[in-house]
């Protein structure tokens, strides 16, 4: 895992190359910036000397970029680390509030996945 928070791109590239030499299966790079520019710059620079090692990104902050755009810069894997969890919290909060208001769960039934569907999902995994 590499981050620009420490010492910038040159340091990140140096560490990435060292990780590859040490046997890393891939390089994960992350940034808190809203712009993907430093990630793209890193990927372009890394790909100049290493075309094989997979690059993994987690576009939580720089979420406007598409997977296709990332791929053009040599990214192999995109991880949406917390978007599903963050989407689930408002729904869980609303259901919890309604249960507290009504002192039962009947009023939230239409917002729940059935147990049968959950079990079917588990069976298919």
What are these model-derived regions, one by one?
Residues 1-80, 87-97:
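Alpha/beta enzyme core
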């Amino acid at each position: 895992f590499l981050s620009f928070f420490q010492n910038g791109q040159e340091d990140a590239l140096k560490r990435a190359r060292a990780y590859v030499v040490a046997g890393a299966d891939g390089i994960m790079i992350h940034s808190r910036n809203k712009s993907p520019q430093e990630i793209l710059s890193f990927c372009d620079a890394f790909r100049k000397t290493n075309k094989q090692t997979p690059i993994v990104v987690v576009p939580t902050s720089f979420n406007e970029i598409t997977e296709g755009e990332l791929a053009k810069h040599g990214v192999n894997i995109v991880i949406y680390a917390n978007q599903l969890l963050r989407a689930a919290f408002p729904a869980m909060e609303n259901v919890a509030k309604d249960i507290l208001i009504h002192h039962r769960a009947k009023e939230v039934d239409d917002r729940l996945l059935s147990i049968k569907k959950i079990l079917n999902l588990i069976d298919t995994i």
